[in-house]
């Protein structure tokens, strides 16, 4: 084992994907990082279905090779009954469209990869207590009956749902429970199933070990009978799963809570919740591992900024702002998706709650949850569907080549957080009704400095200026994007350019 430093820069509780992603990123930045994991690896873990974005994250961590395992299942097609009870939608497989992994194996390999980079690991170990101090945190850890004292400037809690007390959880969706089991696959069942029924919905997929998992998501109140009977009832109501009902074996049905929540105080005096200790997703999205790792990448940037400037308020504000954005976007997306289910109009416990859910922070009022409530209840702007056909860039620029362009009067600016060289900075972001979100950068070009002297310049001179520090084709695409969204206009007395309607 490595020599324990006098004080860690960061100490992480939990060796799941969120904690390991943060550890690897921080180690690459040159920080001393320690970790405690309560269980011995390998250990069984559900959550094997990883969304397509996971490839980019593993490549970013230089760990893409860990996903290249012949036993992992890729390019799985799906059959879906959701919007129309009478119609089965066949979703074809896609290259790098998701992957089914063996989490016990992948987590162990990712941990080994982090240790090879310099991670100080205590496993198995249990946190006895944590005490805030002048220089960070003092942790008492039990390892094989031996008490270990740890000092760390920052603590990351990546212990999953058990890292958040019930009283700290703010539900962002109605309560839900998963009831699940495995049946033998024998390569017969090689596609995923998703189906909505009156008391919830079901997901099925082949997983490692020649097994097929059947998982039902329902309201806890509906579990009046034992879980096995309830699962069988739900399966019998389906078209896709009902042929499998005789393969479900008695005594092998399990349950777990899948209620989506956010922690009421995710950054508390440099004790920071990440992954599912901070925010749990509705299983409908099937992006839980990816989102947890993305949050870890964001917190690594925040920690890097904090350790270089402990007096700055930017790291905490940035992390909480990004977390709120993720929570709100996810909650609204899942609510819309549930509303599209054919059974949503049914007066059943599960679907009525999802139609009428209201965020309630009355028992969890903190600065963070008050900001969350404001964003959660904000009316979402509506954007017209953009033209999907390719824009004829050269043709448009040729028509406007000698025209003078001006910044639209609808353009505004606001200070917002941006990342520059792994540090958080305040930048001026561009706001316009046609843009879905404030823009600081467009294709890695900072917009505010570019806008300073644009008024009255011809299209040709703007292209010439941009092409001095970027490829010509890139400069043309940026300019046409701004023109097509009426951020730039040709006639300053008009609200939009004459070539865009």
Predicted regions and their residues:
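C-terminal helical "tail/cap" subdomain of flavin- and related membrane-associated enzymes
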Residues: 304-397
């Amino acid at each position: 084992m490595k020599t324990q430093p006098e004080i860690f820069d960061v100490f992480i509780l939990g060796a799941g994907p969120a904690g390991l992603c943060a550890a690897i990123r921080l180690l690459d930045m040159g920080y001393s990082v320690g970790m405690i994991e309560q269980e011995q690896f390998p250990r069984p873990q559900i959550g094997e279905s990883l969304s397509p974005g996971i490839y980019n994250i593993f490549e970013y961590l230089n760990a893409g090779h860990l996903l290249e395992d012949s036993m992992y299942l890729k390019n799985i097609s799906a059959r879906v009954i959701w919007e129309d009870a009478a119609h089965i939608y066949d979703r074809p497989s896609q290259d790098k469209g998701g992957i089914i992994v063996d989490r016990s194996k992948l987590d162990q390999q990712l941990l080994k990869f982090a240790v090879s980079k310099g991670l100080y690991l205590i496993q198995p170990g249990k946190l006895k207590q944590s005490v805030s101090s002048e220089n960070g945190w003092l942790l008492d850890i039990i390892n094989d009956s031996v008490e270990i004292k740890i000092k760390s400037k920052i603590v990351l809690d990546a212990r999953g749902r058990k890292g958040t007390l019930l009283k700290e959880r703010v539900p962002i969706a109605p309560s839900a429970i998963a009831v699940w089991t495995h049946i033998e696959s024998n390569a017969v069942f090689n596609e995923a199933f998703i189906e909505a029924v009156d008391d919830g919905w079901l997901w099925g997929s082949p997983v490692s070990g020649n097994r097929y998992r059947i998982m039902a998501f329902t309201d806890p109140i509906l579990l009046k009978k034992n879980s096995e009977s309830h699962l069988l009832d739900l399966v019998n109501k389906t078209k896709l799963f009902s042929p499998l009902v005789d393969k479900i074996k008695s005594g092998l049905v399990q349950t777990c809570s899948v209620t989506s929540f956010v922690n009421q105080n995710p950054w508390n005096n440099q004790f920071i919740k990440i992954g599912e200790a901070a925010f749990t997703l509705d299983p409908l999205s099937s992006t839980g591992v990816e989102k947890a790792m993305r949050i870890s990448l964001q917190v690594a940037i925040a920690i890097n900024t904090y350790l270089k400037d402990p007096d700055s308020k930017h790291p905490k504000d940035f992390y909480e702002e990004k977390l709120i954005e993720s929570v709100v976007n996810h909650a609204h997306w899942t609510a819309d998706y549930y509303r599209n289910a054919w059974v949503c109009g049914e007066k059943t416990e599960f679907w009525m709650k999802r139609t009428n859910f209201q965020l309630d922070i009355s028992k969890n009022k903190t600065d963070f949850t008050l900001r969350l409530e404001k964003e959660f209840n904000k009316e979402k702007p509506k954007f017209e569907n953009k033209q999907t056909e390719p824009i004829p860039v050269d043709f448009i620029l040729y028509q406007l080549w000698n025209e003078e362009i001006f910044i639209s009067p609808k353009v505004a600016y606001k200070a917002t957080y941006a990342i520059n060289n792994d540090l958080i900075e305040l930048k001026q972001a561009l706001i316009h009704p046609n843009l879905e979100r404030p823009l600081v950068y467009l294709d890695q070009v900072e917009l505010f400095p570019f806008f300073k002297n644009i008024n009255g310049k011809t299209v040709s001179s703007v292209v010439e200026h941009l092409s001095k520090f970027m490829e010509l084709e890139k400069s043309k695409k940026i300019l046409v994007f701004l023109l097509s969204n009426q951020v730039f206009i040709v006639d300053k007395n008009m609200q939009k350019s004459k070539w865009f309607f």
